[in-house]
Amino acid sequence: MSDIPNDVMAETSSILPYDFVKQNNIFGIDKNGEIKIYSTSELSFDIHQELFRYIGKSFEVEICNAEELNNLITSNFSVISQNSELSEELKDNFDLKTFAGTITATEDLLSGSNDAPIIKLINGILSQAIKLRASDIHFEPYEDSLSVRYRIDGILQEVLSQDPRLTPLIIARLKVISKLDISERRLPQDGRVSLSLGDKNVDVRVSTLPSTYGERIVLRLLDKQSAQININDLGLPQTILSTYKKSLSESEGIILVTGPTGSGKTTTLYAGLRDLSDSSQNILTVEDPIEYTLKGIGQTQVNQKTGYSFATGLRAMLRQDPDVVMVGEIRDTETAQIAIQASLTGHLVLSTVHTNSAVGAITRLRDMGIESFLISSSLKTVISQRLVRRLCDSCKVKTTINKDIADLFGLKHNLEVYDHKGCDKCNGTGYKGRIAVAECVNVDKTIKDMIHNEKSENEINEYVFKNAPSINSSCSDLLIKGITSCDELIRSNNIKEDAFVSVSYTHLTLPTKRSV
């Protein structure tokens, strides 16, 4: 086994089409008329015959290091590399579905005819996703098709269904783009790539997962502009925004943001950090993963392979003389304990907890074994938020609220509301964009005493939302104003159908009945 020469690694172009290179994990070069094939093992008789048919002359086979070969293939066939720019596929008249229908799978991998269409298809899928504001792209192989789905406004929508024979070609191309090991199909892999769309820069986080009919790939699209959002542009109600800003001005304590996955928690934390960031403060983070880079802030990333966890990172950061620390998520007792101690010793700590309500964060910390007197001493503010889809203004239709739903949300019977329909402007979904709804617990002296005296979650809820809006009352306001639909409220609040036949709705923080 020999190393691939540096001049080959740096400058050589493949004489073989990508499909054949990928399928057989080989690479061919023509150096001054002499053909050399690099491979990690001896070639089979069939591959020898195919190569001779394509090249038309004799060639030499060089056995090489697997990692070097993978790097050589990646560097030569990566069409969307760091900071590359999509071009033709970004045009408004580019029809992704029509183009995808023209691509056919070929059995002859040496024909080379598939390379350009596959590249253009992937470029089109990426550019279309960015234009439609998709947060994720799913490539899902099945026995009879390759399904491509976008997650738009939190909901998955299928946009393409391709010939299953194209699956290995598309998946391999995506792995090359992301600089992943194309020969490794048995283990999950993670990668990252940057794309440029006019004046919009997007980071793409790539995750692969082996499955029955090939590797599944999910691309998470991270708009770099989202990291630059101003705290005043978060869409939080003015009372909650004022509470958040006041808490950020404190020199110590814990600020928590809660909500389900995809509810914008990280964006809220990043906006808070940007508001704090100046040369007079040392701000450090430990994240899993780092979603956006923040200027002037020291960011670190969890690495389970090396044992660098949230708890390990937080403990290490406290030895770096920080003023403010951000922990991506408090998941376990150890992290919670260190965060509490840090907040009691002159540090401002920002983090998230996976609960569906603001007061639920207090219960979650108790369940982790944190004593109530420590929670009451350290906790400053809890913001709970979620994102609700906006009705499309171009096609929303008037309707009358269902009696059961009116009762569930404390609204007047026969209230005129709006429902979704679907049109070209909203891609047939009836919704376009999302709006944040939030609730906030400002831990004042009364709440401190309630936490210290171990009052229940329901008792604290009753006090907090006696004169303040909850998430559910905020959702009801959106319904009354025609901003969202009944179906969306039921979905976003995770209400099950059996709630409509239940005589008790105590699991919801509902507003009092209103005569609107």
Predicted regions: what is each one?
Residues 1-54, 190-198, 202-209:
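Polyanionic, low-complexity intrinsically disordered segments
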Residues 4-5, 10-13, 66-124, 132:
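Charged, low-hydrophobicity low-complexity segments
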Residues 9, 48, 66, 70, ...:
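Alpha-helix initiation and N-capping motif
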Residues 19-30, 46, 50, 71-102, ...:
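Core recognition of P-loop NTPase motor domains used across DNA-transaction enzymes
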Residues 36-82, 234-248:
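Short glycine/Trp-rich loop-beta-loop segment that forms part of the substrate-binding cleft
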Residues 111-128, 132-504, 508:
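Short, flexible helix-loop junctions that flank or precede catalytic/ligand sites
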Residues 509-512, 516:
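Positively charged, low-complexity/disordered segments
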